[in-house]
């Protein structure tokens, strides 16, 4: 697991290689990543946007930006958490992801929360970038 805290918001990520959805002979490798976002602070916040950088084993970077996560813009009161699972395919047997969430406090202050860098590893990769 990978975890990072920004302004009392903890983001924990657990990647998982999906062998049944992957087709190594066709250079298609698929991962799920399970995310937990916890508000360890004293103020209510809302997740508004996401930004991911997905890098494959050859150094090619794909940027992903959009509103919310899995169709939601969750509000997290102090002590609350939100969990979701998403996925990503790569043309290489390994890679890594890193990113951020755009958050806003109940008083309207916007800030970025870091998503920790995490490895996407499969049993088909010889070298691992992370």
UniProtKB/Swiss-Prot annotation:
Stored InterPro entries: ApaG_domain, ApaG_sf, Uncharacterised_ApaG
Domain ApaG intervals: 3-127
Lineage: superkingdom: Bacteria
Gene Ontology biological-process annotations: error-free translesion synthesis
PANTHER family xref list: F-BOX ONLY PROTEIN 3, POLYMERASE DELTA-INTERACTING PROTEIN 2
Name assigned to this protein: Protein ApaG
Source species taxonomy: Bacteria, Pseudomonadati, Pseudomonadota, Alphaproteobacteria, Rhodospirillales
Encoding gene (name): apaG
């Amino acid at each position: 697991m990978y975890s990072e805290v920004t302004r009392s918001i903890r983001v924990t990520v657990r990647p998982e290689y999906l062998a049944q959805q992957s087709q190594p002979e066709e250079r298609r490798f698929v991962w799920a990543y399970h995310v937990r976002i916890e508000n360890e602070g004293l103020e209510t916040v809302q997740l508004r946007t996401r930004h991911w950088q997905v890098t494959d084993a050859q150094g090619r970077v794909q940027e992903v930006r959009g509103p919310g996560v899995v169709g939601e813009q969750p509000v997290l009161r102090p002590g609350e958490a939100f969990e979701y699972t998403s996925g990503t395919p790569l043309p290489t047997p390994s890679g890594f992801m890193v990113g951020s969430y755009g958050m806003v406090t109940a008083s309207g202050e916007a800030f970025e929360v870091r998503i920790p860098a995490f490895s996407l590893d499969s049993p088909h990769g010889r070298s691992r970038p992370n």
